[in-house]
Amino acid sequence: MTNKEFYNKALSESSPIKQVGWENEVKAIKRYKQIAKLVPPKTHTIVDYGCGIGNFAKYVSHSAKYIGMDTHTEFVEFANEINPELQIIPTDGKGNVPECDCLVSIGVWTLRGELDDLQYWNNIVIQVNNMVKHVTGSIIINGFHNQADYKDPKLYYHDISKWIKLANLLGLKMKVLVFEKFEFVIVLKK
């Protein structure tokens, strides 16, 4: 099943959390709340890169201008139908984002599809390199780390040491937090 097929199938689900492929609604809400706490208090504009249908917006849009972005056009169209007050726009998936104070990428780099780990990581590096040019504050990234007990072959498991090298290469400060048993959150700052 391709990524597009996976997300088209997910969109037909009844729960907003399951519509973007998250299996556990309680964990997803907990994830959103914890990541929202990491958004710096004086953030004026936040980009939600890979926003799905904009579920994260309700945790941050009261305190900052929210811009959701997704490569999946069906998500963007549906999100704009159900959240007309939000700005949700398509992205080319190359990390080209509008100017912002903070960018969040929640679970975006998890479903690797047909790419091998090296190809997938190189794609992430290109995206983050482009993002850094447009983000004045924090970049907050959530995903699965490679120390997980069980690994689904369809998913990508991040090697935190690669993130450390990338942060150093880009001149960024980095903080790593463990979320749940096999998830991490990385906060990158200039």
Language-model-detected regions and their locations in the chain:
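Conserved class I S-adenosyl-L-methionine
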Residues: M1-L38, T43-G52
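Class I SAM-dependent methyltransferase SAM/SAH-binding core
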Residues: I53-Q87
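A short acidic, Gly/Pro-enriched loop at the edge of an enzyme's catalytic core
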Residues: G95-L103
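A short SAM/SAH-binding and catalytic strip from SAM-dependent methyltransferases
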Residues: C102-W121
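Conserved beta-strand signature within the Rossmann-like core of class I S-adenosyl-L-methionine
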Residues: V135-F144
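Short alpha-helix
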Residues: K154-L170
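Core SAM-dependent methyltransferase catalytic element
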Residues: V178-K190
